[in-house]
Amino acid sequence: MKPTLVLVGRPNVGKSTLFNRLTRSRDAIVADIPGLTRDRHYGHGRLGLKPYLVVDTGGFEPVVKSGILHAMARQTLQAVDEADVVLFIVDGRQGLASQDKIIADQLRKTGRKIILVVNKAEGMPYSTAAVEFHELGLGTPCVVSALHGEHLGELIDFALEDYPYAEDIEAEPGQEKHPVIAIAGRPNVGKSTLINTLLGEERMIAFDQPGTTRDSIYIDFEYGQRRYTLIDTAGLRRSGKVWETVEKFSVVKTLQSIEAANVVVLVLDAQSGISEQDAHIAGFILETGRALVIAINKWDGMDDYQRDTTKREFERKLAFLNFANLHYISALYGNGVKALMPSVDAAYTAAMAHIPTPKLTRVMLAAVAKQQPPRGGVSRPKLRYAHQGGENPPLIIVHGSMLDHVPQTYRRYLENTFRDVFELKGTPLRVEFRTGHNPYAGKKAPPLTEEEARRAHSRRRRNRKKYG
């Protein structure tokens, strides 16, 4: 799984600017639910072959004992507790503040790896920017400018020096060649109940294997003589015990589990409907390209009218996930839970499918013969052949000419054709267009030799005589 970097510091030291630099995007997921502050952002980035997850916390005010600032401090400490590396950010222009000393003392007690980051140091010599922050006793400071992007590569390289490259990450327990299932969803939708039902229903063989991320557990189990790995983000208790409190929710763990899985079971609450946080999690699943099964829980206790109304609402709001199978279940009573596993198997098979190039090309050419792409100006785009470029999710690469002019509607037409023909149900499908390189594009023709110029002149004279 990706290592987690948590940005901590007092207000207005440039945490959000640094976050946007590290993720190269302003479209971070925002956790806007009770128990998590509004300005906690989650995003992921990559330095070369090293991926990472970044958490941007609110301004840390540890001395405040009540109100919203106290809640923000509590949530910041919770984020630190989930961190692999804490980036403690201070303001190089304002210098060392008393609040920085208090925060440093708080962070030192956590036992996490802490990197002191002196921000807003553009145009300042290293010695000038860093000298007074040695007093904090957190080691040699990293001096950066988030605004101008200065020295950020060195910062991330230092932060990730103890973590493996992408190739090594793929060798983790969650990446073995059998279905790896993550149960995702917001709090109180019944994730824990579903996990216990899955592990207890068929007297499955279960044993706990510590994961590479703190508090995540890989549970290997057998169902129908097939092996699976279930990623439990909340820390699964033995099935004989009762869940005493509302299941713990960690956005970081949820995102990491989604990325580590082959198939995600997204659990929704039939009685409370789809929330904004449900949409955030679904969007992240779609972005990462993981196969998906949707379990709409708490179906018991609803009359026929409520069920009919709820079905229509979910089908309308989940139209952007129309590739996934929907199941209406009661995790508490086990109703409909058995039907989840065949959908998980089908989604896994589709996500890991290997499609031969000749078959892909034949299907693509048949789709083009049935409906050609619209003209993009003077010429019509020409699709020549297709091949598979990846799995989990399947990536189909189409080669041809003038493909930059293929509209989005035609791309969806090809995507739906590939999905229907090759039965890729339960997984996102990505179609990428690549135009062949023209080595002469943008180049002028070489000058004619004397003999070539004489012959061209003769041809022009003959044509004038012939056609007047």
Curated annotation (Swiss-Prot):
| GO biological processes | ribosome biogenesis
Cite the Pfam families for this sequence.
KH_dom-like, MMR_HSR1
Which residue windows does the record flag with biased composition (Basic residues)? Answer: 456-468
Tell whether Protease is among the UniProt keywords: no
Top-level taxon of the source organism:
Bacteria
Q: Which SMART domains match?
A: AAA
Tell me the keywords, alphabetical order: GTP-binding, Nucleotide-binding, Repeat, Ribosome biogenesis
The chain positions of domain KH-like read 353-437
Q: Binding positions for GTP 1?
A: 9-16, 56-60, 119-122
Q: Is Glycosyltransferase a UniProt keyword of this protein? A: no
Q: Tell me one GO molecular function of this protein.
A: ATP hydrolysis activity
Q: How does it assemble?
A: Associates with the 50S ribosomal subunit.
Q: What is this protein's function per UniProt?
A: GTPase that plays an essential role in the late steps of ribosome biogenesis.
Which family, according to UniProt?
A: Belongs to the TRAFAC class TrmE-Era-EngA-EngB-Septin-like GTPase superfamily. EngA (Der) GTPase family.
The name under which this protein is listed is: GTPase Der
**Which species expresses this protein natively?**
Nitrosomonas eutropha (strain DSM 101675 / C91 / Nm57)
